[in-house]
């Protein structure tokens, strides 16, 4: 027996295998954390929920906290709440409760609240939310509140929270709506803010006020400067202030809405332009795009900026770390990229980008078209122009129309330092400790998610930057949100949203702020490794070390105690065996997340399998329809084809076969001549004739006149305008005028019973036949009373109207009354039978021909009407195939 050969693999299967094989390379698995802190540790973390001295909980009936801003000044924490400002001491550390020592109540006055309500705002929105909380000098706090959509600012003593001086307007310094983002900082005694300046939040602005320099702002309502920005952070470095934000990119307007991350800078000493151009506006404002992407043939970008750290020194370079995420309607993912401010400054010295017309794309500006001195530089004494107001108009006009740089700011290593795509909640907050460990030489990054989960990473900036796997180590994952103290029934995820993550390096803790509480969490939980040297050293945590007494201790900077530690990740196989490290990630087990590899593999497999199944299904259905059509054509050909020569017999010539014997004309033997016509007609009838019914009147009584031909088309129906003039016309009991009357020629389309043997020669008209019947010559067939055989639509077809149905009782014809199917006397529809003929069969007619008045010249078919059997019900007029479509 021959062994069957294996069928070659299908192309779809090969494509599926290739895609599945490449998915692992494109989406590498991210390592889980080396350890996960038990959730019961949360019960030991100190929390602030508004408690004051002498009370463990807030007063009964007091409003819940609605924290907006948190500021740490040395060992004091200032918390900006709704209508309140708290001063909390972080020393001495407590393990149960954080309480305020001072409280400032700052409510909106009733008039501001009434105006706010009149503008359509809710009562809960017409409050004073603290949105700006800054240290102005060593003894003064600068605080701004929304004040019921009428922002106001004030100075307060840092020790007593007593007001210092008068209140000032908060316009362009504080947002109207507490939900709007804003940033602010003091530099050289001047306040730099980024917010919106109007009630509708349309006019976004970077604003400088206070100090000894004039007030400046960005150009108003210019999409080249700002397009729906969301301000994230601001830092001071050198002679500039840098603002980090995200906005809709105008240079990608051909791609609909594209959100990109930006960094903009202004000169501290900018005094504005001339009275002709950019008066009281920035002359040094420039912006560039931040590039945080995964390299490859096609870069995968993280465009949504979430958080930025202050300027830190890594390897002697000024660096900021920024958290980026994907858009909310994209694959969830977050990345941490580092940016060197020297590279940022170099980009601002590069090429500009412009759009020559509203319909054109953005292109680089040739260097020969850039005026000198270079636009965007800081004019200062000793330079060609000692002030920005002295700059020529061409330079000022160029700055006004060309604020965007052509190149993007690259991230350090041209790749993210940390990449997480397995998190259900995106990373939105970041804190960095560049002096971690007993020697202060390690860098630890804390990343906070929307739900309060914190991820701790050990970053090695000097390591190879070829990939993210060797650059960072996922040390630990722990929770910071205490639902028993920070939550309330019906609070949902809004109350769990992480507002800020502040590092308190002096006490070795993190300050996690939520809308209703502030939790202080230790940066490490070394005690969970006590009793197991392998776990303590294998954790690679720079905050933990193995002590000689057999415990895992916390190592603060400058620790002099003896300990063992290994942050390089060396093998711990020689350190004994004990309970393994906790590796069950909270983000995987508790949140029930799915691996990106599994997600991509499942999506690709579902697409390929669905495409293959759909293709086979469509092909099968199309083939089935073709096979049915082919079988139908073959059946019709087999019915109409007969004889040796496969000659086609026209149904309109079946009447000629009556005159032929079994052998054809003259008794000749023609192929198929002996086939009775009813046998050929039966398959064509759509209503399923019974053979016995066909043959009950004789096998050769089918008349060619009773089969309509395709050339014939019925005429439209006609109503009877007046009673029929014939004395035997239909009386009052006849059909109404909406039903057609039978024409005289309709008798040629009715099947009548006859004896088994037809006469060889028809008798003369009016003479009796051998069986006692009178023979009447048929008139020529008229097209207005016949139907075509096929139901195909044509412009000349007429609608077929159903006539009233009912049994035809021939016995009642003698009373002279019209019947539901009584023919007009001018054109008898039946052949009169002999006196001894059998009674006619009961007929129920469901369709009729279009009717008209009796035509002149119609002759009676017999001397008098006699009952006969009507076989009209054998024709498929009642079937669906015989119903003509409406005339369009």
Swiss-Prot record:
All residue ranges annotated as the Sema domain in the record: 31-523
GO molecular function: chemorepellent activity; semaphorin receptor binding
Tissue spec: Expressed in the brain in GABAergic neurons.
Spans annotated as Disordered: 651-679, 695-742, 757-888
Gene Ontology process terms (BP): axon guidance; central nervous system development; hippocampus development; neural crest cell migration; positive regulation of cell migration; semaphorin-plexin signaling pathway
Record localization: Cell membrane
Cysteines engaged in disulfide bonds, as pairs: 116-126, 144-153, 267-378, 292-337, 486-517, 526-544, 532-578, 536-552
Signal peptide interval: 1-25
Source species, domain of life: Eukaryota
Stretches of the chain found on the membrane's Cytoplasmic side: 625-888
Membrane topology of this protein: Single-pass type I membrane protein
Record GO cellular component, one term: plasma membrane
KW Signal (keyword) present: yes
First-listed, main subcellular location of the protein, grouped into a coarse class: membrane
Family: Belongs to the semaphorin family.
Biological role: Functions as a cell surface repellent for mossy fibers of developing neurons in the hippocampus where it plays a role in axon guidance. May function through the PLXNA4 receptor expressed by mossy cell axons. (Microbial infection) Acts as a receptor for P.sordellii toxin TcsL in the in the vascular endothelium.
PANTHER family tied to this protein: SEMAPHORIN (PTHR11036), SEMAPHORIN-6B (PTHR11036:SF10)
Record: disease: Epilepsy, progressive myoclonic 11: A form of progressive myoclonic epilepsy, a clinically and genetically heterogeneous group of disorders defined by the combination of action and reflex myoclonus, other types of epileptic seizures, and progressive neurodegeneration and neurocognitive impairment. EPM11 is an autosomal dominant form. Clinical features include normal or mildly delayed early development, developmental regression after seizures onset, inability to walk, severely impaired intellectual development, poor or absent speech, spasticity, ataxia, and intention tremor.
Subunit organization: (Microbial infection) Interacts with P.sordellii toxin TcsL; semaphorins SEMA6A and SEMA6B constitute the major host receptors for TcsL in the vascular endothelium.
Protein name, entry field: Semaphorin-6B
Source organism phylogeny: Eukaryota, Metazoa, Chordata, Craniata, Vertebrata
Gene: SEMA6B
């Amino acid at each position: 027996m021959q062994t069957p050969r294996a069928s070659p693999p299908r192309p779809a299967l090969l494509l599926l295998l290739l895609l599945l094989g490449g998915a692992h390379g494109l989406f590498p698995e991210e390592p889980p954390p080396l350890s996960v802190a038990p959730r019961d540790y949360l019960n030991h973390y100190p929390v602030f929920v508004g408690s004051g001295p002498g009370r463990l909980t807030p007063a009964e009936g007091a409003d819940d906290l609605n924290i907006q801003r948190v500021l740490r000044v040395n060992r004091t924490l200032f918390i900006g709440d709704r209508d309140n400002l708290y001063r909390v001491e972080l020393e001495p550390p407590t393990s149960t409760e954080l309480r305020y020592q001072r409280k400032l109540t700052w409510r909106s006055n009733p008039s501001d609240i009434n105006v706010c309500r009149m503008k359509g705002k809710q009562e809960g929105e017409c409050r004073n939310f603290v949105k700006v909380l800054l240290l102005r000098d060593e003894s003064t706090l600068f605080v701004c509140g929304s004040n019921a959509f009428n922002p106001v600012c004030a100075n307060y003593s840092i020790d007593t929270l007593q007001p210092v001086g008068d209140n000032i307007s908060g316009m362009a310094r504080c947002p109207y709506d507490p939900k709007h983002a804003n940033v602010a900082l003091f530099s050289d005694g001047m306040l730099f803010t980024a917010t919106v300046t109007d009630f509708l939040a349309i006019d976004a602005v970077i604003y400088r006020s206070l100090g000894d320099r004039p007030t400046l702002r960005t150009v108003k309502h210019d999409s080249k400067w700002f397009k729906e920005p969301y301000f994230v952070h601001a830092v001071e470095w050198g002679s500039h202030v840098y603002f980090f934000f995200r906005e809709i990119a105008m240079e990608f307007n051909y791609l609909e809405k594209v959100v990109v991350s930006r960094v903009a800078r202004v000169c501290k000493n900018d005094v504005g332009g001339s009275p002709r151009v950019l008066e009281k506006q920035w002359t040094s404002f420039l912006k560039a795009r931040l590039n945080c992407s995964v390299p490859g043939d096609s870069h995968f970008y993280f465009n949504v900026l979430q958080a930025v750290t202050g300027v830190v020194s890594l390897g002697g370079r000024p660096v900021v770390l920024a958290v980026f995420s994907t858009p909310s309607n994209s694959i969830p993912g977050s990345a941490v990229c580092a940016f060197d401010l020297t590279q940022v400054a170099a980009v601002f010295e590069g090429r500009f980008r412009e759009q020559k017309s509203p319909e054109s794309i953005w292109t680089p500006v040739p260097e020969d078209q850039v005026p000198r001195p270079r636009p965007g530089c800081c004019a200062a004494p000793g330079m060609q122009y000692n002030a920005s107001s002295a700059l020529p108009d061409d330079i000022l006009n160029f700055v006004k129309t060309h604020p965007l740089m052509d190149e993007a700011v690259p991230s350090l290593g041209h790749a993210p330092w940390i990449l997480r795509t397995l998190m259900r909640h995106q990373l939105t907050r970041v804190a960095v400790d560049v002096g971690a460990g007993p020697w202060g030489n390690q860098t630890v990054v804390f990343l906070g998610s929307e739900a309060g989960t914190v991820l701790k990473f050990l970053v090695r900036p000097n390591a190879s930057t070829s990939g993210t796997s060797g650059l960072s180590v996922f040390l630990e994952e722990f929770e910071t949100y205490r639902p028993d103290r920070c939550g309330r029934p019906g609070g949902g995820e809004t109350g769990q949203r992480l507002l800020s993550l502040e590092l308190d390096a002096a006490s070795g803790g993190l300050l996690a702020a939520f809308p209703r509480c502030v939790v202080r969490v230790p940066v490490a939980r070394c005690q969970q490794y006590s009793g197991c040297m392998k776990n303590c050293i294998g954790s690679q945590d720079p905050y933990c070390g193995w002590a000689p007494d057999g415990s895992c201790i916390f190592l603060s900077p400058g620790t002099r105690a003896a300990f063992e530690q290994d942050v390089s990740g060396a093998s711990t196989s020689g350190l004994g065996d004990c309970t393994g490290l906790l590796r069950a990630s909270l983000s995987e087990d508790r949140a029930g997340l799915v691996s990106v590899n599994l997600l991509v593999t499942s999506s690709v497999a579902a697409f390929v399998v669905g495409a293959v199944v759909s293709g086979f299904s469509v092909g099968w259905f199309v083939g089935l329809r073709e096979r049915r059509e082919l079988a139908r054509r073959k059946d019709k050909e087999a019915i109409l084809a007969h004889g040796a020569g496969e000659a086609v017999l026209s149904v309109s010539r079946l009447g000629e076969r009556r005159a032929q014997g079994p052998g054809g004309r003259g008794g000749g033997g023609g192929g198929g001549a002996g086939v009775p016509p009813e046998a050929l007609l039966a398959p064509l009838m759509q209503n399923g004739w019974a053979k016995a019914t066909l043959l009950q009147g004789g096998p050769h009584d089918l008349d060619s006149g009773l089969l309509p031909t395709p050339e014939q088309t019925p005429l439209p129906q006609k109503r009877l305008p007046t009673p029929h003039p014939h004395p035997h016309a239909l009386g009052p009991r006849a059909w109404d005028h909406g039903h057609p009357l039978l024409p005289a020629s309709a008798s040629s389309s009715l099947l009548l019973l006859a004896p088994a043997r037809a006469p060889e020669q028809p008798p003369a008209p009016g003479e009796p036949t051998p069986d006692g019947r009178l023979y009447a010559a048929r008139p020529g067939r008229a097209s207005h009373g016949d139907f075509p055989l096929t139901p195909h639509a044509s412009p000349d077809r007429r609608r077929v109207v159903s006539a009233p149905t009912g049994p035809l009782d021939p016995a009642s014809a003698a009373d002279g009354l019209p019947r539901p199917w009584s023919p007009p006397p001018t054109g008898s529809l039946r052949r009169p039978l002999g006196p001894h003929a059998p009674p006619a069969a009961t007929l129920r007619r469901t369709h009729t021909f279009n009717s008209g008045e009796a035509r002149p010249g119609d002759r009676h078919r017999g001397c008098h009407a006699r009952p006969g059997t009507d076989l009209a019900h054998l024709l498929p007029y009642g079937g669906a195939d015989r119903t003509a479509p409406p005339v369009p």
